[in-house]
Amino acid sequence: MNIVCYGLQWGDEGKGKVTTYLSREFDYVVRYSGGSNAGHTVNYGEFKLVHHLVPSFDIRGNTKAYIANGVVVDLDVLIKEIEEIKKIGFDVYDRINISSLTHIVLPVHKMLDEKLEIAKGEKAVGTTKRGIGPAYADKVHRIGLRLVDLFDKETALEKLKFISKMYKNLYGIEWDDYEILFENFEKLSRIIVPPLEMKEELKNANVLFEGTQGVLLDIDMGSYPYVTGSYCNTTGVESGLGFPIKIDKRIGVFKAYVTRVGKGPFPTELFGEEAEKIRIAGREFGATTGRPRRCGWLDLPILRYAIETSGCDEMIMTKADILSGLEKVKVGIRYLSNGRKFEIPNDISMIDKVTVEYIEFNGWKNLEDDNFAKFVDFIERETGLKIAYISTGEKIDDIRKV
């Protein structure tokens, strides 16, 4: 069986924990998009890991991992992650493969990312400055460097010199320290494989595809221009993988409230003491940047939008425990714009111009409370989808089947 596990909001839904929990039943976990801008936190109890590039698979088991060519890879970050895992007693080099067609994030990409954010001023997107957008841009400009290019050092050096010249002439960015790149490549060369080799490997395997960010950050279907540089919707699986594959189920992960990092529209956003209470209780600070996340009430119109555009089959709810103890919990149920009501936005670009109609629930003391059961039932009715699992805490096994 092949399943996609992905985010239904603006990322940070708890996909890392959920994917790691589900991974035990699969032969492979495959990352198909994004880069080191992802920050998937996994709490094993005795230790905690933050995955930026290593797919979220249970390192204590037998599941293998694959980084497909839809991902852009910072070799330094990937090596450091693998080495960090090794330090706690798990050598995963023999359980990870990476596509030879994967594009590489270079130092010039990070420099340009920062320059662009500064140049945009108040219109800055609020990127992680990890060079993800510029790396994808070079891929589209057909000047990007792939892992396969590094097998021929002489040709790779020619390409690197050309890239350096372009960045110096166009942006005033200088970089010519190529040797570290080749050193990192040597460390990873034995795990690099052609996509068609992985096609054979995955043909008869049970595969869990791990989404990064969330549908609302997808380069096409997200809240553009406040989005990431990749296809993080379920539609990105096959393009990111490089070959067709049958998807049996799409499982969308959402938080019982909403957060987002950086700028962009956020119809149900909370401010002041209300927002800070949720932010502190939920530890809502970016795993990649450490930035405080913006917090707000659950937004059903935008959740329905994400469900429709991704073909979601069932959902997993996370962080409902964070709302335990609140006297009242609100849910945005529809948008109001120019005298009209919207259950789901036809055009996501409209959401910065709407007001929100809310419904209020009595709060719950814990997740066994009848008030919480009413909250869950309401969401299932309003979305038309079953909530298959509910996360009950921070650790991997703090999750229950509904």
UniProtKB/Swiss-Prot annotation:
It comes from the Bacteria. IMP binds at D12, E13, G14, K15, N37, A38, G39, H40, T128, R142, Q213, T228, R291. GO terms for biological process: 'de novo' AMP biosynthetic process; IMP metabolic process. GTP binds at residues 11-17, 39-41, 293, 319-321, 391-393. GO terms for cellular component: cytoplasm. Keywords: Cytoplasm, GTP-binding, Ligase, Magnesium, Metal-binding, Nucleotide-binding, Purine biosynthesis. Its EC number is 6.3.4.4. Pathway: Purine metabolism; AMP biosynthesis via de novo pathway; AMP from IMP: step 1/2. Its main location: cytoplasm. PANTHER family: ADENYLOSUCCINATE SYNTHETASE. Belongs to the adenylosuccinate synthetase family. Plays an important role in the de novo pathway of purine nucleotide biosynthesis. Catalyzes the first committed step in the biosynthesis of AMP from IMP. Homodimer. This is Adenylosuccinate synthetase. It comes from Fervidobacterium nodosum (strain ATCC 35602 / DSM 5306 / Rt17-B1). The gene is purA.
